Amino acid sequence: MGYASIPSRGSGAPGETDYDGRAVTDLLSTLRDELAQIVDLGVAARVLEWDQLVMMPRGGATTRAEGLATVHRLAHELFVRDEIGELLDRLEPEVADLDPDSDDACLVAVTRRDWDKARRVPPALQGEMTKLGSEAMEAWAEARANDDYASFRPWLDRTLELKQRYIECFPATDDPYDVLLDDFEPGMHTDEVRRVFRRLEPALRELTAAAADDEPEPFLSGPYPRDAQHELSLEVARAFGAADEYFRLDPTVHPFCLSFATRDIRLTTRYAEDDLHGNSLFSTMHEVGHGLYEHGGDAALDRTPLATGCSSALHESQSRLWENVIGRSLPFWRWFYPRFRDAFANALADVPLERFHRAVNRPRPSFIRVDADETTYGLHIILRFQLEQELLFGGLSTADVPEAWNTRMEELVGVRPPNDRVGCLQDVHWSGGMFGYFPTYQLGNVLSAQIWERLVSDLPDAYERVEQGSFGEIYEWLREHLYRHGRKFTPAAMTERLVGGPIDPEPYLRYLADKNASLAAA
């Protein structure tokens, strides 16, 4: 595993900084070699996670949890070694003279941030969190299937206990929730999330209330045969740019995307034969957005910490852009509806395009976040953001979660879940310890509108391209301006480069208002 220590500084060739005869380029190569092994362990863990959620029989949960804990612990121990810190100490003054946007300068800066943070977390705690997350996911899946919150509650209690211990590793943080948010949105503060959500909540509630209270369209309940859903989902995924050579699509309970490398992307989806809103096409377009971000990264960054998306919010901006801004647009359905209607003729043969488009976009309060329309979706996220803070810091007992959830759903969304399966048990995130992730979904929605405005300023015929089923130029624009950079820049810096300013909810609210107005006029 490399070396035992970094030699003291020596004198190199004229004009070249050298450590005991080794050039800076050699030290960078050493750092890359060390990091590559750690990244490889992370990939191995993701393969195990993918298998657990897609292929593994339920009986394998305990041994899988132990195996994942071992892999994560080994990766953590390798990364937090003193030798990595010494390498960074030697390299930082040297790369200071490089272009700050260069791969080498960014690699050192990002590795330093990651290393400093990881050093605060004891390996034993890291292993406990990983093992518990794997076991709790299986407990959640069973509890959800049986509508049995009581059986999941002990797992949630234990998860919250470990999250509190994790937060205590970072005592200097202004707001303890910042620690959790930073895992997914580095550098963002909880106050900034509150600022955005304070602007969004009343506006989203007003937009929801203004929507006509239509009776559900009968064709929403299908039938939508699973095999046809799968074929159409693959067709659109390929059209967007998810080539079979680099992507695969599998069914799962809760759709997700995992990237093992820029050329190995795993997509998952779910199928609902009796609910158009749960049609696999929408979840597939969402996960393809994540996958395209990973696939569009510079392959030169593979096997480094830079080879992934910049942040969860920017990642979600891409899943929501491809799913909603493109995939729920009228131009998209002008292109794809003839094919879709033919595949589901039993449900849609007599349904005109405009009626179909209106049905899949109209605001409609509903129980399930992943099936929510664009307007009410943010209210689902605000609910989770509030409850997470109350669970961790506000005295909300896990015993009271179902009632707190249902009451808040009535207040924010306007519906009360009839059971916990479509209430507090619907999401996998808390079982996996992913506290702090939910806000990034709505931040991603906000960013998707900002990014689309910027894209259209360069490609004013973007929607015309969509209507022709031509997505290549859109993908290439996103790859050039966002995807290829991976994690080289902080989320704030990447957002500034991408849209010319910080995250701003106004373009998103304009987008929703314009869309809802056009739907009302249809």
Q: Which sequence ranges carry the predicted segments?
A:
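Contiguous, non-catalytic segments that form substrate-binding/exosite surfaces or channel walls
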Residues: 129-277, 516
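N-terminal amphipathic/basic-hydrophobic helices that include classical n-h-c signal peptides
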Residues: 1-22
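Divalent metal-coordination and catalytic microenvironments
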Residues: 31, 171, 286, 319, ...
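Post-HExxH zinc-binding segment in Zn-dependent metallohydrolases
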Residues: 308-348
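Secondary-structure capping and boundary motifs in well-ordered enzyme cores
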Residues: 63, 125-128, 155-158, 196, ...
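Active-site recognition of the HExxH zinc-binding catalytic motif
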Residues: 279-298, 316-320
